A protein has these predicted regions:
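Predominantly the C-terminal beta-signal and adjacent terminal strand-loop region
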Residues: 83-87, 157-206
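Residues that define the transmembrane beta-barrel architecture of outer-membrane proteins
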Residues: 28-30, 56-62, 104-110, 124, ...
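Sec-dependent N-terminal signal peptides
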Residues: 4-14, 20
Length: 206
C-alpha cells in the first residue's frame, strides 16, 4: 500500500501540468460530499469458537468528505466513515435455528486523502482518490448464553480496537454542475467497492 501511495503521488505531481488546461470550468477550491458504499472492508476482530460461525448483515458504509483543491487537478482532504454490521450466531446457520448470540459491530474511520481530477468539463468530472488513516471499532453483544456456548470475545483494550484504514479509488465519475453533482466511484477500502453520493462545491470568493 505504501508503494501505491508513492506512485500515486508521483503521478499526481507530473500530471498536474498536463491536465491543468482541461480544468477551465470546474475549479471550486472547497468541496463537500456525502455518500453510501457497498461492501466496505472491515478489520473487526471477533472470531467465534471452532463450531460456530456467524451470518453477517452488512449495512454498508456511510461517509462524508471534505476536499481542498491545491491546484485545478490536485486536492487533499479528510474523510469520515461509519460502518455498522450485524452478526447472528446460530447452532445451525443454514436454517437459522438455535440462536446463540446477536452482535452489533460498528467502526468509525478518519482518513486523509489525495484526489486527482483527471478530466473536468462543464458537466462531467473524472477522478481518482487514495486515502489512509485509522479505524476504531466496537461491538454490542446480545442474547448470549455463556453457560451453554463458548465464543471467543474481542479484546477489551482500546489499543486493540484501533486498526489501519485505507481507500483506493482508481476511477470515479461526477455528473452535474460546478456547484452540485452526483457521483459514483469504484474501488476498495472503507468507502466500499461501489459508492454513490452527492458533491457540493462552495462558491469561491471573487
Amino acid at each position: 500500500m505504501k508503494k501505491t501511495i508513492l506512485v500515486f503521488c508521483l503521478i499526481a505531481f507530473f500530471s498536474d501540468t498536463a491536465f491543468a488546461q482541461l480544468d477551465s470550468i470546474r475549479s471550486n477550491k472547497n468541496e463537500f460530499s456525502i455518500g453510501y458504499g457497498l461492501l466496505p472492508v472491515s478489520s473487526f476482530g471477533f472470531s467465534p469458537w471452532s463450531h460456530y460461525y456467524p451470518t453477517e448483515d452488512n449495512v454498508g458504509a456511510i461517509f462524508a468528505t471534505y476536499t481542498r483543491r491545491l491546484t485545478k487537478v490536485i486536492g487533499i482532504g479528510a474523510t469520515y466513515c461509519f460502518d455498522p454490521r450485524v452478526y447472528n450466531y446460530y447452532e445451525n446457520p443454514q436454517t437459522k435455528e438455535g440462536p446463540i448470540a446477536h452482535l452489533g459491530e460498528s467502526s468509525h474511520t478518519l482518513m486523509f486523502h489525495l484526489k486527482i481530477n483527471w478530466l473536468n468539463t462543464k458537466y462531467l468530472n473524472l477522478y481518482s482518490k487514495v486515502g489512509q488513516g485509522i479505524m476504531v471499532w466496537g461491538y454490542n453483544l446480545k442474547e448470549y448464553q455463556p453457560d451453554l456456548f463458548e465464543i471467543n470475545m474481542p479484546s477489551n483494550k482500546f489499543i486493540d480496537r484501533i486498526n489501519y484504514a485505507y481507500q483506493f479509488v482508481p476511477i470515479g465519475v461526477e455528473v452535474g454542475t460546478k456547484r452540485c453533482a452526483g457521483f459514483i466511484q469504484c474501488g476498495i477500502g472503507m468507502e466500499g467497492i461501489i459508492s454513490i453520493g452527492f458533491r457540493y462545491g462552495l462558491k469561491d470568493k471573487e
